[in-house]
């Protein structure tokens, strides 16, 4: 039995619909997203959020593969449900009457509806990796990539060299590595009330800010970190106008989200501050350790606090959590 089966059978659906089509979507909304704004689930599947917490460092590409499997599960079920809805509509038009299902047909439809995955948050700590967002996809040169992959801080000379990987998220170049939590948020925006993409981004920011207040300052302690952060005109979460502690970038396909946020707990900041990150040449990265040197809070502590705060802001009352070292990925 794979580890994935431990989570629940409604998490995994092999793809039967071929390749997923990536669509460029521009989200426009007049809905104002504020720090006090709240949404709530409007579909039963969204009332529980599941947190898969990876507690060991893994390659960035492995994390992306794991994320894509869960995104495809959402997309495949949406496609199946849409197909059933179209067929039912066509039958009603053909017979000019409402279609009455027998017991077994209704049971099949009910089972399909219950297969819809819950919102899921994957939290990782990656091996050193520079990732490019969509804004640099056609601009970055081989020479620039070589500089990223050739940069080895003096304290990291015996550790793995960084890689450069192009990612399907918004934004420009950022860094993921040890000492940093990366949280990928996979959910269907349409299963929540008034939650366009821009409001999800605001919700993620607010969850990170709240987590940095309430996460334990010391492992096993009830004393909160109480690190005060803010938003600025630039994306992400900031300790000051010049010091960024969390970066955000999401991707949306047919209302299903992926990617999310990274929060600096105790990374080697020279990976970030030796280059221009997120296109902000005059800004610098900071971390919990730099801001609160005596804190012993860990990446895993911050991961738990972030997911709990995200659930609150989404109006979700149940968080199911499982800790994993790795998750086998099987291809068709």
From Swiss-Prot:
Function description: Catalyzes the transfer of endogenously produced octanoic acid from octanoyl-acyl-carrier-protein onto the lipoyl domains of lipoate-dependent enzymes. Lipoyl-ACP can also act as a substrate although octanoyl-ACP is likely to be the physiological substrate.
Similarity remark: Belongs to the LipB family.
GO cellular component: mitochondrion
Note from the entry: In the reaction, the free carboxyl group of octanoic acid is attached via an amide linkage to the epsilon-amino group of a specific lysine residue of lipoyl domains of lipoate-dependent enzymes.
Entry keyword Metal-binding: no
Site residues, Lowers pKa of active site Cys: 244
Reaction(s) this enzyme catalyzes, per UniProt: octanoyl-[ACP] + L-lysyl-[protein] = N(6)-octanoyl-L-lysyl-[protein] + holo-[ACP] + H(+)
Active-site residues (renumbered): 278 (acyl-thioester intermediate)
Species of provenance: Kluyveromyces lactis (strain ATCC 8585 / CBS 2359 / DSM 70799 / NBRC 1267 / NRRL Y-1140 / WM37)
Catalytic activity, EC: 2.3.1.181
Pathway: Protein modification; protein lipoylation via endogenous pathway; protein N(6)-(lipoyl)lysine from octanoyl-[acyl-carrier-protein]: step 1/2
Protein name: Octanoyltransferase, mitochondrial
């Amino acid at each position: 039995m794979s580890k994935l089966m431990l989570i629940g059978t409604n998490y995994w659906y092999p793809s039967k619909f071929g390749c997923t089509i990536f669509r460029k979507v521009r989200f426009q909304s007049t809905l104002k997203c504020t720090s006090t704004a709240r949404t709530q689930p409007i579909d039963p599947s969204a009332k529980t959020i599941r947190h898969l917490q990876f507690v060991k460092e893994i390659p960035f590409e492995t994390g992306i593969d794991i994320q894509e499997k869960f995104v495809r599960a959402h997309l495949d079920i949406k496609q199946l449900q849409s197909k059933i809805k179209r067929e039912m509509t066509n039958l009603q038009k053909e017979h000019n009457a409402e279609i009455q299902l027998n017991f077994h047909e209704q049971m099949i439809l009910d089972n399909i509806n219950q297969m819809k995955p819950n919102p899921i948050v994957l939290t990782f700590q990656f091996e050193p990796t520079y990732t490019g967002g969509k804004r640099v996809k056609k601009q970055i040169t081989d020479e620039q990539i070589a500089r990223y992959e050739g940069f080895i801080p003096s304290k990291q000379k015996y550790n793995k060299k960084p890689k450069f990987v192009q990612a399907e998220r918004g934004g420009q170049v950022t860094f993921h590595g040890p000492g940093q939590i990366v949280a990928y948020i996979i959910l269907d925006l349409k299963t929540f009330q008034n939650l366009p993409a821009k409001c999800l981004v605001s919700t993620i920011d607010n969850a990170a800010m709240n987590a940095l207040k309430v996460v334990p300052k010391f492992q096993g302690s009830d004393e909160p970190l109480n690190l005060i952060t803010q938003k600025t005109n630039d994306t992400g979460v900031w300790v000051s106008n010049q010091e960024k502690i969390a970066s955000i970038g999401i991707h949306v396909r047919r209302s299903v989200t992926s990617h999310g946020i990274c929060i600096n707990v105790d990374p080697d900041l020279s990976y970030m501050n030796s280059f221009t990150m997120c296109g902000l040449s005059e800004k610098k990265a900071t971390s919990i350790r730099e801001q609160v040197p005596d804190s012993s809070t860990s990446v895993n502590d911050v991961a738990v606090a972030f997911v709990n705060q995200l659930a609150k802001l989404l109006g979700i009352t149940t968080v199911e959590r499982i800790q994993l070292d790795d998750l086998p990925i099987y291809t068709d």
